[in-house]
Amino acid sequence: MNVKKGVFAGRFPLVKKMFLCAAGVMSFWFTCNDVIASPRDYNSTVCLPDSSEEILYNGIRLPEAWPPDTESPESITPMRVPYLENIPDIIPIDVGRQLFVDDFLIEETTLNRVFHQAEKWEGNPVFFPETEHELGERHKNKAVTYLGHGGVFYDPSAQEFKMFYTAGWRGGLALATSKDLLRWERPELGLAGENLILPPGPLMAGGDNAIWLDLNAKDSAQRYKAIIERLHGWRSNFNTRDDSPTHTLHTSADGLIWSQGITTRRAEDYSSFFYNPFREVWSYSIKKSVSGRKRFYAESKDFMRGASWENMVYWVNADSLDEPDSEIGNTPQLYSLNGIAYESIMLGQFYILLGPYNRVCEEGRFPKITELKMGFSRDGFHWDRPDRRPFIEATRDEKDFDRAYLHGTMGVCLVMGDKLWFPYTGYSGISPDGYRGMYTGASIGMATLRRDGFASMEAGKKKGILLTRPVTFRGKHLFVNVDCPDGELQVEVLDEQNRVLKQFNAKTSRPIRTDKTLQKVEWQAGDDLSDLAGTPVKFRFHLTNGKLYSFWVSPDKSGASHGYIGAGGPGYDGVIDDKGINAY
């Protein structure tokens, strides 16, 4: 047998907001002093991690010095992932579906791991320039609706998807809504005209933005969170690189009326943030150029009070495994990085810039190429990037809306039934009237992936096995995500000494011959594993002619994983799967 071993606390005062005057005319009471305030105005302090050792939900132990300042921005060596070098002896699996994106869960296997790319929706683009704000010329570019970063989230209170996007190149911040991610409406907001939330301008919508819907906000006034770039002249700023404030943090109760901004430390455009619920911290993804575009990291328990980024460290960049475009030849760079909690891991959406250089694109009036790749993390900081193919690829064909300059969005992905949905922006470089420009012709599309479908462990006609490391759980029912309608899956349970438990052996495991993203495992003795709760055990999967994507132990027969579901989806009350099959 060919065996592979281990293949928000406190409310911030709102000074001046946008409001409708008595005559019904919109007034904007943002001035430089209004928008830009210092963190010390609110006695802000960065919530530094406790000096004691931190043990995560999955048994990973973090070092006392956190975030770790161990890497160099000058290095192109792939990021070390310490938890894959020092895996816990026993892994708790109470949180979420357990994915096979790395060897963290695997003691030994004869199955082959295969990574999968997203499939673009055949009806793309699903959202494109239509209004005067979107079609009009700004900064020598036209016909633009883009996620930069914006945000796409499911709002269970409104029972709809909300998309925050930019209308026009460096234009206003706008809102669109949808019931299915495919058909979108532009609600009349009565704020800045049509569906605009904030009009264009460095003190209003800014250069780019990143929006987050925080369904677990302790203060309802901070349900929405945002970072907005404040370049007073975006082109001149890139030339001078002066030290003027460039970003502000904001909160909002409804995503429409926003608080006064708190300035951050110096950073470049396309800086963003995400929430790590496993550690209950806000993680800031900060763009800085050090021999090319790189990412720096800071974190805080409180979103607004973390604006000072006092614990900022170098984080990650494109590395030696990111291949250049064969025709362009430029060294790849990390343009942006968004994160989201999905089931038991953090997903990282890496924007990899392949060139050409900006001046070449401006002179030629065509877009540069960025593509979206995926990374995976179990501690929210260290990224494992085993598959360097584009997860969503630029076509490089000017007839396509996603020819180049692909962007993902805040929230990264959403859940509907047995699929994950990934919103993304693409640029063709051409407007409907034939006008060409580097940042022209931007529309928004969707890409899908099987739920948990980032990687599968696969067997052919010859039976293969996968043995997990010792795990513990408090649930009762074992579930799998498996594709084997022409094959078979059986499961057995072992103790730490690899002795098969008689009542849960492979011979009495009821054969599974199906293609389902949520399938219960049963034995002749039943399906109740509660007697094993708290006891370290191993699962051994026997697979023929099939693909195994994930497994988990649920406390109830619905198969609810109690893991995270990205930016949410219909059928869920929040961003945790407590519904199981009832949300399908």
Where on the chain are the PLM-derived regions?
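N-terminal secretory signal peptides that target proteins for export/translocation
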Residues: M1-V15
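Residue-level detector of transmembrane insertion/anchoring sites
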Residues: G6-V7, A23, R170
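Short stretches within intrinsically disordered, low-complexity N-terminal or propeptide regions
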Residues: R11, G24-V25, P39
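Bacterial N-terminal signal peptides
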Residues: M18-T31
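Carbohydrate-active catalytic/glycan-binding domains of CAZyme proteins
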Residues: S38-Y584
